[in-house]
Every structure is written in structure tokens, then in C-alpha cells.
Amino acid sequence: MTAQPPLHHRHHPYTLFGTSCHLSWYGLLEASVPIVQCLFLDLGGGRAEPRLHTFVVRGDRLPPAEVRAVHRASYAALASAVTTDADERRRGLEQRSAVLARVLLEGSALIRVLARTFTPVQIQTDASGVEILEAAPALGVETTALSNALSLFHVAKLVVIGSYPEVHEPRVVTHAAERVSEEYGTHAHKKLRRGYYAYDLAMSFRVGTHKYVLERDDEAVLARLFEVREVCFLRTCLRLVTPVGFVAVAVTDEQCCLLLQSAWTHLYDVLFRGFAGQPPLRDYLGPDLFETGAARSFFFPGFPPVPVYAVHGLHTLMRETALDAAAEVLSWCGLPDIVGSAGKLEVEPCALSLGVPEDEWQVFGTEAGGGAVRLNATAFRERPAGGDRRWLLPPLPRDDGDGENNVVEVSSSTGGAHPPSDDATFTVHVRDATLHRVLIVDLVERVLAKCVRARDFNPYVRYSHRLHTYAVCEKFIENLRFRSRRAFWQIQSLLGYISEHVTSACASAGLLWVLSRGHREFYVYDGYSGHGPVSAEVCVRTVVDCYWRKLFGGDDPGPTCRVQESAPGVLLVWGDERLVGPFNFFYGNGGAGGSPLHGVVGGFAAGHCGGACCAGCVVTHRHSSGGGGSGVGDADHASGGGLDAAAGSGHNGGSDRVSPSTPPAALGGCCCAAGGDWLSAVGHVLGRLPALLRERVSVSELEAVYREILFRFVARRNDVDFWLLRFQPGENEVRPHAGVIDCAPFHGVWAEQGQIIVQSRDTALAADIGYGVYVDKAFAMLTACVEVWARELLSSSTASTTTCSSSSVLSSALPSVTSSSSGTATVSPPSCSSSSATWLEERDEWVRSLAVDAQHAAKRVASEGLRFFRLNA
């Protein structure tokens, strides 16, 4: 096969089929005409191998006001100005972003086509191969051509290290310095306002199997990374830079923003040193330029001429592929998220011919994001955060028919990425039955394909590595809300239409649905009808297929439905954001671009079935910092079967369920061996509660359950990944740290004083981590579930006390839990010879003692656990 000659050696216009990978602002030339660079991937058309080119595109002439906005000041100058207030600085950043984004997305008719990155286009260049003259969406391109071409390219993995000056507080506080201290929301912005900088930089690029290390001005190394070409355009000399073999640059989410910006500034100086023509724009917008931080997203409008983004951790970075990069960029729906709403594309929805009138499906549209959680509120109960909670009985659940009017939507704007505050809300569901997680696998992807044209979102790229198609689609839909309201509302309405009919059908068929997430994930119990048992999976599949055909018609079957896993019926919503329960899965590395989608976490083996079931309930349980296991107690009064004794004596605390001396490695399905974080350990233990509480338990048996959590914590006490949490910028008190880290969602651990310690995955665990804070919160979750179980047992057993004819004789002095044929747990009353009043008194005493015993057990085990952590710190 004859190699294709370079474009700049040709003397006639040439047509190329390929895709735009990135648009960047080069500069303003004569008559205020903006020039945009386009990194273009030529697919080769079967004549040659795919190849990267850099072209220029003319934009429409800018008005004088926008020209002044571009030339006035850089992002850094606008963000660090001490003569303006915070609102004025923010408006300055937004105004500059709006001008740059308008040119990069809508600067001309050609730019509007090329701004749809990683979608097939056809272009025509001038004879010199410099300027794109025409561009249009490509028709008839093989669906796998783009994926095959991208598989031949790489992502450059960039790691930058350096040194920082010591930060000294000023002895004399000036008025400006006082304003900085009052206004900053993160350590990062405070440092920026005080002139923080980095020096002694060293950077490493890994492209495929090759690694390039730059510590000085090594032009030979740069020549292997970037191809430089000087061209003359509109009587101006330009230097076009094209990456060699890679289509994007990725960094870890722990990369310091200041080091990253400094690295690209250094490379810019080397590549354009001694250049007499006009260099491209050099600017940077990142989360460190905002007072309260922002998403971990980077916008380099001019140089480098490739997209730059962050992934979660060094291990993920080393496995990043060009297909992952394409998925990441596609999910932006325009420019990186840090640019804001001005950086998103306008996407027109498809005109649909549906079998349902508009007013029937449009009513289900909501502003909630794709990861929003919808709870079945028929059994919601709220309890006050303060007061004597042990004896406060909640009101009975509301009963409004099928319960479809009793739904609470939980916002998920952060994706559950960060832990709530100490005074968070626990929303608890407990039921002694097998709960199924039913997944509509490809619902979101197929609805998006129906509503958005392929030229706006390419559905044919194979997302099979870091990012799943669902994660890309979900973030793309989220970004439609800013400038494509009609498309966003259409998609959300159709998804809500199907989701709401699934839960309505479950309720009508006698199935208890507990929670739905993102329109595609449902937590449902099997049920019974007059004809026999009803399968949750079959019910959901039938409803989805029925309403899919009703909407779109034809013989095309609906999206695929399956039971992803099953576990005992325990779910806890923490702070309206994170789900904790006995489910053994995580949401991938997360989603595009942002933080991981921390969804349901837990560690229970799928398929475990509880037996008889107690009336299910979702109860709001408020947790204050002093509740649950306090983490502080008198060591002399700790349990004799405590952690230290269990380590060597084999004392079992009187429990034949879980011996307190059982080492963590011997615990069935232990998350210590399977991985997962501390919430996984808690979720695993929560899954054992329904089976444990079917009959009366002693204090020592309750202590054994709390001690199981403690054992798991002790076994992973030095494991960094086990304790890491993801925190949002500006929402917590963060300890001072080197670099610029806390300006975006960052990983950290709790300290005993309630502060947040910035913690890297690749360094040793902080010596002063607050183990007691984790123990306190974990024990509070367990105690909340026990209390909910006790009160639901009390509520569900009321009906069984009205008659003696259906009662059974107790085998012990106190009532025990038995299974009823209706699938709910009841407390068997004493025989007719016993006094009903006496039995009620015994029952109430037992139920109240269960909650009190759980609180006492939590305090005793927390006391011995804290003693161990102090001695072994």
C-alpha cells in the first residue's frame, strides 16, 4: 500500500473523512478574525493508516467588546485581582469563558460542525493543507471505523512533580491580606491570592510503551512528543503543534493543579522559544481559580492543542486508552465542565412519533439528575435529631393506596461522591426478605439514541474499558440541561415515564419496591398474588417491554432487564447521597470525568436469602455526632470479651452466631479479602441483621455484631483505600497541605478533631487518622437499623394481639419472632390463659430493651476499639 503524502506537499484541495478530536483557540489575526486550531484524525479511508493532522479554521469577526474581553487579562489575573470583590472576579471569569466558548463552539458554520468531537465528518482543505474550507457530517461511514482508528492511538499519561515554597503567615496583616483570609474557601485559592508557586519541575509522559522524562529544556524529547510545523496564514506566521501518537493527555485526580499549569507553561516556553511569528494563546482555567473550588476539570483554551482531563488514580491512568479519552470528551457535550454552562453545545432533540400523547409522558420530566434516588415514601418516618430518641415512637406509616404519591426524590448533584456532615440523616429500610436489585441494562443508552442525532452524540464508539456506555450517556444528558433544555426535558420525561410505570406496576402486582436510582435500577421484593408468587424480575421486564413498544412501536424488543444481585432487605441512605447495604458491587471507576459514582456499597454475597420477613419500612433516623458508638469510653469498663481478649483468649462473648474471637479472615464473604472500603464492611454486617434478629438476642450477641465491624476495621487499619472518602471543596475544614489539592473533589480521611486530612492513595496512611470517627459513624448506622427493626416489629405485631384464637404458646418468657404466611414477621402472643395486658407489657419491654441494648453494646465495643487504636497508632 502506498503511503499517503503529507497534506502540505499537495497542490490541490483534498477531501478527508475522519473526526475532530479537539478545537483550541490560536489567536486573533487582522480585522478581529479569530483563528481556531483543529486536531483532526484522518481515518485513511482504506487508502492509508489513520493519521493526526492540525488545521486552522477561521471564525466570524468578533465585536469590539469581545475582543477587549480576550485581550484584557488572563484567567489567573482575573482570579487573583485584589481590587475587586468575589462576585466581580467570578463575573470576569465567566465573561472570558463565554467569549472563548462561543468562538470554540459556534465561531462559524465550520466550527459548529467540528465542535461535535469524535463524530464522523468530511472536510475539504486548501491546497497547502493548512485551512479547512468545508466541513459536513459524514454519511455512510462504517460504524466501527472510528473505534478501529482510535485503537491505534494512545493517551499520553502525564505525571508532574515539583517543589513548593514554605507558606508563612504574615506578621503584619494588611487590609488586602485580611480580605484574602476572610474570602477564601479553600487552601488552594488562599495560596493563589498570596502568590504561591512551584519550582524544580520534573514531568513524565508515557505514550504507549514509551516513557519520556523531562527535567530540563530537552528539545529532543519534545520532538518525539510533538510535531511542529510553521505555516503562513493571512500574512502571519503560525506554528502548529501536533501530538505524535496520542489524542489526549490524562493526569490523576491527585495531580496538583499548580504543577500541571506550570508544566504546560514550561513546555509552551520551550516549543515557542525564538519563534518570530504569532504564538497561540496560553491560558488556563482550573478549580484553583475559584474561591470555593470547582469540578476537577481543566480548560487550556489555546495550548496544549489536545484535551487534558483527570482520571481516578495512578492504576487507572496507566490503563487509559484513546477510546476512554473519546468517551470522556464526548460526555462533556462541548468544553470541559470547568467552563460552565457557556461551554456546552446546543443540541436539538429529534422529532419523535410516539404512540402516547405528549401530555401523558411529559408530566414525568424532572430536574433531578440521572443519578437521583427515588424512595418509596409510604413507610417514611421521621424522628427528631435531639431529645430522648430511645423512647420516642414514630407515627404510623401513611397508607395512600399503591403508594405512588408517596415518593421522595433525593438529589444526587454530587453523585454521592462525598460524605455528609456529622448531623446527617440516616434513612433506613429493614425487612427480613430477599431484596432484588433489578437493572434495566441499556435503557438510558437506547432512549438517548432515540432523542439525539448521531452527529451530536456518536453511539457507535466502543466504550469497553474504563468507561461504560451508560456512564458516558448519563453525563452527556446531565450536560444537556444547560443549553439544550428541550432535549434534556424530552429524555428525562421518557425515562421518567418508563420508571414510574415500573414502580406503579410493582405496587399493583403486590411487589414492594423500595428504591429506584437513575431510572434504570430498582430494588424490589418478590410478591404474591391470587395466582401464586410474582417474580420481581419478570414483572419489571414485562412492564418495560410493554411500555417501550407502546412508546416507540414496532417489533423491536424493549431494553434488557435482569436481576443484578439479591441480598437481605437492608438499605441505608446516608445523608441523602450514599446507599449502604449488603450489595457486592461498585459503580465502575466512575463515570466520565468527575468523581466516582459512589452508589450502593456493601459486601454481602449475592443470592443469600433471609427467611421470614418483617414488615419493611424506610425510616428517617437522624444521627448527631454524639450518637451511636461515641468512640470515647472508660477502658476499665470495656467488655471482658473485648478486642484485646478476643485476640488471644478465644472468648466468644456468649454468642453462637459470630464469635467475638473469630478473626476477620475467617468471616464469611469478608470484605477484607474481597476489597472494598469501610462502608462495604458496614454493609456486609448490616445484611446479617434480619436473620440475627428473628429471635431474642442477648447483649453479648449484639456486642458480637458490633465487634465484627471492629474486627474488619482493625484488619484493614493500614489500608489506605479502605479509609478513603471523597470530599467536596470548601465544605469541610481541611488541614493545611502541600500543593494545590483541595480546590476540587479530593480524597481524604477524617481526623479525630473532625478535620479532613488530604490523603493520597499512593502514600502511607496519615498517622493521625481518626479511627474513632469511622467507628462512631459505622456503629450509628448499625444502631439505627436495630432500632428501626425493633419499632417495625412493634408496629407489625399490633394486629396479632387482638385475638387469642390464632396465637401460639410462647416457648420462653419473652415473645419471639415467627414467620407468618403473609410474608411479614409477627410476634406470637401468649396463650389465652395469659393476660393480654401482661403480654403487651412484656413485648414492649423486650422491644425497648433491644434498642437500648444495641446502644449500650455500641458504646462498650467502641470503647475497647478506641483503646486498641490508641495503643497501636
From Swiss-Prot:
GO (cellular component) term, any one: host cell nucleus
Output the GO biological process annotations, alphabetical, semicolon-separated. DNA replication; viral genome replication
Q: Where is this region: Disordered?
A: 394-422
Task: Please provide the record's keywords in A-Z order.
Answer: DNA replication, Host nucleus
Q: What is its main location?
A: host cell
Q: Where in the cell is it found?
A: Host nucleus
Subunit: Associates with the primase and the helicase to form the helicase-primase complex. Interacts with the origin-binding protein. Interacts with the polymerase catalytic subunit.
Entry similarity comment: Belongs to the herpesviridae HEPA family.
Job of this protein: Component of the helicase/primase complex. Unwinds the DNA at the replication forks and generates single-stranded DNA for both leading and lagging strand synthesis. The primase synthesizes short RNA primers on the lagging strand that the polymerase presumably elongates using dNTPs. The primase-associated factor has no known catalytic activity in the complex and may serve to facilitate the formation of the replisome by directly interacting with the origin-binding protein and the polymerase.
Give the protein name, as stated in the record. Answer: DNA helicase/primase complex-associated protein
Organism source for this protein?
Human cytomegalovirus (strain Merlin)
